[in-house]
């Protein structure tokens, strides 16, 4: 009996020692996690300043469509990441995509009052979808606090190909540089091959643009061409 009692006592002591080791490890893991979170928070604050809360998130996509087009939005960058023409197909009967995720990128440069330069492409927006009798409205909101934000507002008419976009700032004066009177835009897009003959498609591909006060101009359709625009343009389009 004495031997059995000694073995039981030894087993209990070992069990209690193991529990203490596991408790200490759990405390150490918790402290490490807290430290890592604090470090991540400090990194976000250093990089994004006022926009630190929008610097972390999970990319999510959702689609909005009317009778003619289907647009896919991403909360990362607050942008349209894919556009499909309904009721039309490519030469091989696949859906006619103007661009798909990975083909295009859109971002705006923000100059903040705390001397940071931030691109909206890396920030996470809150999507707000609403409807009127004439259109669906997708508002992608970039919030600084509960009462200060920048909205990217997309209006998709019920029966039209054209989608409008406008940018509205609400109570952002103290967060943006006082010299901010416009936003620099970065737009890149790969032109997809939707026709069977690549040579034919390349022959007629071109880019059109219109200055604010001048007529429309275009790059050459028949040769490689480029142009650096110095003035403001009202719109840019390609085919």
Model-flagged regions — what are they?
Residues 2-38:
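Long, low-complexity, compositionally biased polyampholytic IDRs enriched for Lys/Glu and Gln/Arg
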Residues 45, 52-239:
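Soluble non-transmembrane domains of integral membrane proteins
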Residues 26-61:
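Short, Gly/Pro- and small/polar-rich lid/capping loops
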Residues 1-2, 239:
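Accessible peptide chain termini
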């Amino acid at each position: 009996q004495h031997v059995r009692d000694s073995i039981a006592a030894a087993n209990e002591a070992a069990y209690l020692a193991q529990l203490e080791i596991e408790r200490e490890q759990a405390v150490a893991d918790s402290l490490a996690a807290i430290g890592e979170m604090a470090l991540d928070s400090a990194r976000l604050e250093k990089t994004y300043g006022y926009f630190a809360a929008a610097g972390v998130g999970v990319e999510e996509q959702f689609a909005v469509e009317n009778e003619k087009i289907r647009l896919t939005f991403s909360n990362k960058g607050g942008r349209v990441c894919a556009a499909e023409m309904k009721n039309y197909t490519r030469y091989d009967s696949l859906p006619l995509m103007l661009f798909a995720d990975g083909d295009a990128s859109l971002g705006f440069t923000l100059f903040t009052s705390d001397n940071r330069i931030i691109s909206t492409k890396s920030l996470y927006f809150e999507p707000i979808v609403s409807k009127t009798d004439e259109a669906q409205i997708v508002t992608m909101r970039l919030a600084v606090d509960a009462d200060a934000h920048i909205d990217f507002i997309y209006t998709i008419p019920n029966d039209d190909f054209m989608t409008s976009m406008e940018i509205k700032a609400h109570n952002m004066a103290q967060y943006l540089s006082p010299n901010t009177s416009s936003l620099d835009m970065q737009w890149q897009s790969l032109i997809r091959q939707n026709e069977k003959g690549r040579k034919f498609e390349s022959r007629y591909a071109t880019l059109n643009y219109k200055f604010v006060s001048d007529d429309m101009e275009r790059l050459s359709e028949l040769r490689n061409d480029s142009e650096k625009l110095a003035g403001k343009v009202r719109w840019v389009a390609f085919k």
